[in-house]
């Protein structure tokens, strides 16, 4: 049996969210750098250089890579032999970790979650609640993965329900010109 303190879960979630706000994964940096080295177009090379410079400055200054620090999604694998020391539910621990991360005085992250998105649309100002996916697994460990998904890419989006026989490529070719720059 493994005993996990509420505070350890909370702080782990908060630390992980701060970390991903200012560090790109190493494989991303490596891939952009390799593409930069191969690139022949000056404009494309300049764009990749800006990404690499921004990434370095964010890591050094511990500042967000992007102003849209996203909707938090947390993936939990909870071992069946895990016990909790404290009186908080797992969802409460995760959301307290999100709250601490987004309100951290040295690196306040942009809160963009609404408490009632279909009604009053009031910003929670701490980016809670998180989207939490929980899986109970054999064992005595807790595995926590966090992601922060920005919404900017959805600002210009379309949704379609296609029949199985419809062509996705045809729909994209027809729709893309109607979306503007």
Regions found by a protein language model. Name each.
Residues 1-181:
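Non-transmembrane, aqueous-exposed alpha-helical and coiled segments at domain scale
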């Amino acid at each position: 049996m493994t005993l996990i303190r509420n505070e350890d879960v909370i702080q782990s979630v908060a630390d992980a969210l701060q970390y991903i706000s200012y560090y790109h994964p190493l494989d991303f940096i490596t891939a952009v750098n390799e593409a930069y080295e191969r690139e022949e177009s000056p404009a494309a090379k300049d764009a990749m250089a800006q990404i690499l410079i921004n990434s370095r400055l964010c890591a050094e200054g511990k500042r967000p890579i992007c102003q849209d620090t996203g909707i938090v999604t947390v993936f939990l694998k909870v071992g069946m032999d895990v016990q909790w020391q404290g009186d908080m539910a797992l969802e409460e621990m995760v959301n307290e970790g999100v709250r601490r991360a987004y309100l951290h005085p040295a690196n306040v992250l942009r809160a963009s979650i609404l408490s009632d998105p279909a009604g009053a649309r009031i910003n929670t100002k701490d980016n809670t609640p998180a989207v939490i996916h929980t899986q109970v697994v054999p064992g005595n460990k807790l595995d926590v993965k966090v992601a922060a998904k920005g919404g900017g890419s959805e600002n210009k989006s379309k949704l379609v329900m296609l029949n199985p026989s419809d062509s996705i490529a045809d729909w994209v070719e027809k729709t893309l010109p109607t979306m503007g720059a």
